[in-house]
Amino acid sequence: MLGADIEHYLAELVARLDDALGDRLVGVWLFGSGALGDLDPATSDLDVQVVTTVRLPRAERERLAARVSHPELPCPVRGLELVVYACDDLRDALGPAFQLNLNTGPRMTQHAAYDPAEDPRFWFVLDVAIGRDAGRPLAGPPPAEVFPELPAPLVLASLREALAWFAANDRKGDQAALAAARAWAWAE
């Protein structure tokens, strides 16, 4: 359990997603530190993955982003990282291709991307590689029933890209060390 305020937030998030998507919603899963048991509300994000049966029109994705963005839905931790995929896009040769990547919250910069070319793909490869086994269902089946097992060479290339990104962008090394530990755990 993540605490009553976080659990309530996740329940409201799922309710809004279900209301907006209806029978096109395959499921909603908590990935990342929230699922792995090391969430720190001051510094962590809630990493939530959503899968739909079909690709949604851009205007609908924009409305969905507005409906779940902070402060419309106040986030009780640093932020929400919400990624929405269509089933068919999970098996893209370059790695899972999102239809919405939303970062929103009281202590993070608002970011919404609607094309997988807008953000580095390695983030999504690593999230799916780890989360398919360690994710927590918020609605729908266990993640391994929906998220594919990704090819090891793709995941290893993504790990190298992530470590290079952290070397260039995380001068203190805090997040790089955490990412390296998670990568090591996946590799074992």
Question: Where do the PLM segments sit?
Answer:
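Conserved NTP/Mg2+-binding pocket subregion across the NTase superfamily
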Residues: 1, 66-170
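Helical scaffold of the NTase/Pol beta-like nucleotidyltransferase catalytic core
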Residues: 1-29, 59-61
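Surface-exposed alpha-helical segments enriched in charged/polar residues
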Residues: 11, 15, 66-69, 185
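Catalytic metal-binding acidic patch
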Residues: 30-66, 70, 79-84
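Hydrophobic alpha-helical packing segments in soluble, helical-rich domains
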Residues: 160-188
